[in-house]
């Protein structure tokens, strides 16, 4: 239930009004005039959301629009939901978990902050909420960005490393804008699938991007994006892939176009695949997978020039990311969406570079099992960080 009167929310509204000089309305996408002069993380609007049964350990849930930075560092509006734990903040403030969600789609209806029972991302949110409840029970405040272009103006540059870095880091900054004394400078990032790649990018560049904050570590659950160009190469060599791949691939194409407009998916795909591409502009991944019963007979046009697409995708690959903070990777051995061999190859790469990395496998685990079982692994990771033992995990790696 929404609480009609809440002292903390009143304080938050008052604080934000003092920062912005204007009253806060419910989040809206028509904020372009405000964003140019605002600093990254500045809150542009705030509204209270229902604390549903999904988040039993949350005292409040807030929806914010905040100033962030896009693919080319341009000012953008991004949205996120915030979960505050029960009880009063500790003396040094609540530590923060930034949650980077997995692939939902590129349409605005795919933004997790707008989730509702029976909605296109609700089944995923049900799984994610169990993991986030564990962090709330630990006394962490949670901020969950939607990423650029999900629920806000503009297209979603799916899997663009720079954009995902910015929206995650600036969401943490936005949380500190609410009431700085209530939040600790220490924070962690955890992400799944698409968000796993985002968490790895934050692990590589988060300290440099936000030196005023204290990033302690990152957790990547079944992270996508190893040799990211491989998805296009796979489709090229398998012109009639299984429907799940055919439903997912338009998200890759539209995400690439959002970041690099010279990539025009309609010029690359077959007319039959073009119909799926059109659906992907307004439908979420779960809907696309449900709708597509049979793959198109071909994906690409004959002689399509894929070099710009492959070059762009390769630039977003996680093997380009070298973490500067401890990283834990969790991967199911029966994951059919993220190849465990690629995830392990990335771990090998980091160990050869002598980066503090923990690799946890889930025997027989599928793509979502890394998220379902993240609570146990997170507890272990926190203990390792607290004892400063992460360096030992790759010390015997050959």
Feature locations, PLM:
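Catalytic-loop region of hydrolases
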Residues: 25-92, 351
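Gly/Ser-rich "nucleophile elbow"/oxyanion-hole loop immediately N-terminal to the catalytic nucleophile
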Residues: 84-93, 173-192, 210-214
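Short beta-strand element of the alpha/beta-hydrolase
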Residues: 92-104, 114
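Alpha/beta-hydrolase active-site loop
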Residues: 158-179
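Gly/Ala-rich beta-loop-alpha elbow adjacent to hydrolase catalytic centers
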Residues: 191-195, 199
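Accessory cap/linker subdomain of secreted extracellular hydrolases
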Residues: 221-320
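C-terminal catalytic histidine-bearing segment of alpha/beta-hydrolase fold enzymes
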Residues: 301, 305-311, 337, 341-398
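Short beta-strand/loop motif that positions the catalytic acidic residue
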Residues: 323, 328-331, 335
């Amino acid at each position: 239930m929404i609480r009609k009167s809440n002292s903390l929310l009143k304080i938050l509204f008052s604080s934000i009004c003092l920062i912005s000089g204007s009253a806060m309305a419910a989040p809206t996408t028509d904020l372009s005039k405000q964003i140019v002069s605002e600093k990254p993380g500045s809150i542009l609007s705030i509204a209270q959301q229902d604390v549903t049964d999904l988040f039993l350990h949350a005292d409040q849930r807030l929806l914010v629009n905040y100033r962030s930075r896009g693919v080319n560092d341009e000012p953008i509006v991004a949205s996120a939901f915030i979960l505050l734990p029960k009880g009063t903040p500790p003396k040094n403030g609540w530590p923060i978990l930034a949650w980077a969600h997995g692939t939902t789609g590129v349409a605005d209806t795919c933004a997790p902050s707008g989730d509702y029972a029976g909605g296109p991302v609700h089944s995923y949110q049900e799984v994610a909420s169990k993991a986030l409840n564990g962090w709330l029970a630990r006394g962490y405040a949670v901020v969950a960005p939607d990423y650029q272009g999900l629920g806000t103006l503009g297209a979603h540059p799916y899997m663009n490393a720079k954009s995902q870095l910015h929206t995650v880091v600036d969401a943490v900054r936005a949380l500190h804008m609410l009431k700085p004394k209530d939040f600790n400078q220490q924070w962690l990032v955890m992400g799944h699938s698409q968000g796993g790649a985002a968490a790895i990018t934050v692990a590589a560049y988060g300290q440099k991007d936000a030196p005023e904050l204290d990033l302690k570590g990152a957790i990547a659950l079944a992270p996508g994006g190893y040799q990211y160009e491989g998805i296009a190469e796979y489709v090229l060599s398998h012109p009639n892939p299984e429907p799940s791949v055919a439903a997912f691939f338009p998200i890759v194409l539209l995400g690439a176009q959002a970041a690099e407009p010279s990539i025009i998916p309609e010029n690359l795909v077959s007319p039959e695949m073009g119909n799926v591409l059109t659906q992907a502009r307004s439908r979420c991944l779960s809907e696309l997978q449900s709708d597509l019963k049979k793959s198109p007979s071909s994906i690409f046009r004959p002689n399509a020039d894929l070099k710009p697409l492959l070059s762009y995708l390769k630039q977003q690959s996680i093997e380009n990311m070298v973490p500067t903070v401890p990283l834990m990777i969790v991967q199911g051995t029966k994951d059919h969406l993220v190849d465990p061999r690629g995830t392990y190859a990335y771990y090998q790469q980091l160990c050869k570079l002598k980066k503090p990395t923990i690799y946890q496998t889930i025997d027989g685990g599928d793509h979502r099992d890394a998220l379902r079982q993240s609570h146990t692994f997170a507890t272990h990771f926190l203990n390792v960080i607290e004892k400063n033992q992460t360096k030992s995990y790759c010390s015997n790696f050959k």
